[in-house]
C-alpha cells in the first residue's frame, strides 16, 4: 500500500497539476469576446482546457527525463520524482506519451483546429526539452509561444476571432513572464545557474531587466489599443473595456 502511494505521489507530482493554472489562458479569447453567455462555448473551452492540461503534464514527464542530470544539481529540482529516482525513466516516458495523445484527443473534441494547436504546442515543447532550451533568446521565445498557443487553442476550439492587439498583448505578456523567470533564476543561482541551464550564461541581470521593462511596456500598450478598439464596437452604456485598463495604469 505504501509503495502504491509513493508511486501515485511521484506520478502526480511530476504531472504538476498546480501548473494547470497557466492553461486558464484558453478561456481568455472567448471571455474577452463575451462568448461565455453560451453553454456551448463554455463546454468547448473546458474540453480544450482538459486537453491542454493533459498535454502539458505529458511534456513535464518527458522534460524531467531529459533534464534529470541537471535537476540533480539544482537545490530544489533535485527533489523531483525522476531526478530523485522515485519514478523510472521508462515508466515516465510511457506516461508522458500517453498523456500527450490523450490531451490532443480531448482538445480535438470541440474542433480539430484546437487539437492541432495543442499538437503544435506538444511538438514545440518536446523540441524545447531536447534542443531549443540551450539557445539563448530562442528559449525565451519558445516559453512565450507556449502561453500564446494556449490562448490560440481556446479561440480555435470555440471559433472565437482574436484581434491582433489582443494577441500581441498576450505575446508580450508571455515574454514578460519568461524573462522575469530567467531573471529570478540568475539572481538566485548566480554563476552556478549555468550548471542547471546553459542558456543563462548568455544573459546578464541588466539585459534581462531591460527585457522585462520592454515587454511590460509593450504589453500595456497593446492591451490599451485592444481595449479602445473593442470599446468602439461594443455599443455598451458601461465602458467595460476602458475600465479594464485601470489596474494597468
Task: Go through each PLM region and give its residues.
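Helix-loop junctions at the membrane-solvent interface of multi-pass transporters
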Residues: 32-35, 109-110, 130-131, 156-157
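Cytoplasmic-side transmembrane-helix entry/capping segments in multi-pass membrane proteins
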Residues: 136-146
Amino acid at each position: 500500500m505504501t509503495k502504491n502511494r509513493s508511486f501515485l505521489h511521484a506520478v502526480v507530482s511530476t504531472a504538476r497539476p498546480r501548473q494547470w493554472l497557466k492553461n486558464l489562458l484558453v478561456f481568455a479569447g472567448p471571455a474577452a469576446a463575451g462568448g461565455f453567455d453560451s453553454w456551448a462555448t463554455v463546454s468547448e473551452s473546458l474540453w480544450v482546457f482538459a486537453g491542454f492540461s493533459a498535454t502539458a503534464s505529458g511534456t513535464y514527464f518527458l522534460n524531467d527525463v531529459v533534464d534529470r542530470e541537471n535537476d540533480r544539481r539544482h537545490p530544489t529540482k533535485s527533489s523531483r520524482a525522476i531526478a530523485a529516482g522515485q519514478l523510472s525513466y521508462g515508466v515516465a516516458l510511457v506516461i508522458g506519451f500517453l498523456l500527450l495523445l490523450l490531451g490532443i484527443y480531448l482538445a480535438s473534441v470541440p474542433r480539430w483546429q484546437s487539437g492541432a494547436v495543442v499538437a503544435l504546442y506538444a511538438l514545440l515543447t518536446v523540441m524545447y526539452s531536447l534542443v531549443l532550451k540551450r539557445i539563448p533568446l530562442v528559449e525565451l521565445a519558445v516559453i512565450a509561444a507556449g502561453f500564446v498557443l494556449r490562448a490560440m487553442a481556446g479561440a480555435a476550439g470555440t471559433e472565437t476571432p482574436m484581434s491582433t492587439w489582443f494577441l500581441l498583448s498576450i505575446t508580450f505578456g508571455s515574454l514578460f513572464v519568461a524573462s522575469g523567470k530567467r531573471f529570478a533564476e540568475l539572481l538566485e543561482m548566480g554563476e552556478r545557474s549555468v550548471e542547471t541551464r546553459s542558456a543563462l550564461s548568455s544573459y546578464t541581470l541588466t539585459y534581462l531587466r531591460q527585457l522585462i521593462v520592454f515587454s511590460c511596456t509593450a504589453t500595456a500598450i497593446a492591451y490599451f489599443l485592444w481595449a479602445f478598439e473593442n470599446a468602439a464596437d461594443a455599443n455598451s452604456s458601461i465602458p467595460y473595456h476602458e475600465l479594464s485598463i485601470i489596474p494597468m495604469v
